Amino acid sequence: MQIFVACPRGFCAGVERAIETVEIAIRRYPEKKIFVYHEIVHNSRVIQDFKARGVDFIEDITKVEPKSVLIFSAHGVSEEIEKYVKSLDLVLVDATCPLVSKIHREVQRFEKEGFIILVIGNRNHAEIIGTVGRTKTQAYIVQDPEDIDNLPSITGKLAYVTQSTLALEYTSTMINKIKEKFPNVVGRSDVCYATQNRQEAVKALAKEVDLMLIVGSTNSSNSRNLMQVSSKICQKAFLIDNYNEVEPDWFEGVDRVGISSGASAPEILVQDLVSFLKKRFPSAEVSDFKFKEEKVQFKLPII
């Protein structure tokens, strides 16, 4: 058996920055309670590890305690949440991914210039909620083609932005449909470099293997999209949180296995999976499937 591990995979620069932010806060404020608004990243292993060290993840901002440390997750927050928190007696640290913050500025620029804004993405995702919450006027969330069909007639200036972790094919389809209905719309895809690189690497790898295993949590948008990309090409494709979820019958008739991981999945989970497969198949050969090198790094926020 041959095992190919996609490169790039796993943590992106925004996730690394967010996780390191929490790590530094734990060390810098040992006497303070640390809260994170939303999961810092969408991965169960990361969240469980931080919870074991006393970090409290909250969805209700009013649950934050005075004199504590509050960290915004990588997904960003609305302007209303930010203003509310700044009125409280606590230490605020913003771990919003810089590429998400860029989308926030884009939305605010469009609004200032008098555009009505379409936001393409999952209406229940923290990033989309935060992005829409950066506008003071009407913004429409479009999650599927039917949402575009149901949009009212818009005669003024119209612009769109997108969630940063969407599937490339889906994003292209949605943008093209918007342009068909509103030929004068302006905007561009905001799908980030890491999402694009991981999807393109998985697309190339899936063509070469009999089985694709994507490591990531089910609430991770980018992990689910890697799974969808894989399943359109490779007949056997599965999304797993860790190696314990692997089923023996998946390997029937399989000679070549491809592995990748979502941008919020720790590398240790991939290595655990590889070790598990090598124990199960002692003669298996493991190699990297090199698609593209990433060198992006972001500065840490002020902590």
UniProtKB/Swiss-Prot annotation:
Cofactor(s) the protein requires to work: [4Fe-4S] cluster
Cofactor binding summary note: Binds 1 [4Fe-4S] cluster per subunit.
Gene Ontology biological process: dimethylallyl diphosphate biosynthetic process; isopentenyl diphosphate biosynthetic process, methylerythritol 4-phosphate pathway; terpenoid biosynthetic process
EC number: 1.17.7.4
InterPro entries given in the database record: LytB/IspH
Sites where the protein binds [4Fe-4S] cluster: 12, 97, 192
List of residues binding (2E)-4-hydroxy-3-methylbut-2-enyl diphosphate: 42, 75, 125, 164, 220-222, 264
Residues involved in dimethylallyl diphosphate binding: 42, 75, 125, 220-222, 264
Protein residues bound to isopentenyl diphosphate: 42, 75, 125, 220-222, 264
Active site: 127 (proton donor)
Pathway participation: Isoprenoid biosynthesis; dimethylallyl diphosphate biosynthesis; dimethylallyl diphosphate from (2E)-4-hydroxy-3-methylbutenyl diphosphate: step 1/1; Isoprenoid biosynthesis; isopentenyl diphosphate biosynthesis via DXP pathway; isopentenyl diphosphate from 1-deoxy-D-xylulose 5-phosphate: step 6/6
Entry keyword set: 4Fe-4S, Iron, Iron-sulfur, Isoprene biosynthesis, Metal-binding, Oxidoreductase
Catalyzed reaction equations: isopentenyl diphosphate + 2 oxidized [2Fe-2S]-[ferredoxin] + H2O = (2E)-4-hydroxy-3-methylbut-2-enyl diphosphate + 2 reduced [2Fe-2S]-[ferredoxin] + 2 H(+); dimethylallyl diphosphate + 2 oxidized [2Fe-2S]-[ferredoxin] + H2O = (2E)-4-hydroxy-3-methylbut-2-enyl diphosphate + 2 reduced [2Fe-2S]-[ferredoxin] + 2 H(+)
Enzyme class: oxidoreductase
Superkingdom in the source lineage: Bacteria
GO molecular function: 4 iron, 4 sulfur cluster binding; 4-hydroxy-3-methylbut-2-enyl diphosphate reductase activity; metal ion binding
Positions of transmembrane segments: none
Gene3D superfamilies assigned to the protein according to its UniProt record, in alphabetical order: 3.40.50.11270, 4-hydroxy-3-methylbut-2-enyl diphosphate reductase, catalytic domain (3.40.1010.20)
Stored NCBIfam families: ispH_lytB
Family the UniProt entry places it in: Belongs to the IspH family.
UniProt function note: Catalyzes the conversion of 1-hydroxy-2-methyl-2-(E)-butenyl 4-diphosphate (HMBPP) into a mixture of isopentenyl diphosphate (IPP) and dimethylallyl diphosphate (DMAPP). Acts in the terminal step of the DOXP/MEP pathway for isoprenoid precursor biosynthesis.
Designated name of the protein: 4-hydroxy-3-methylbut-2-enyl diphosphate reductase
Organism whose genome encodes this protein: Neorickettsia sennetsu (strain ATCC VR-367 / Miyayama)
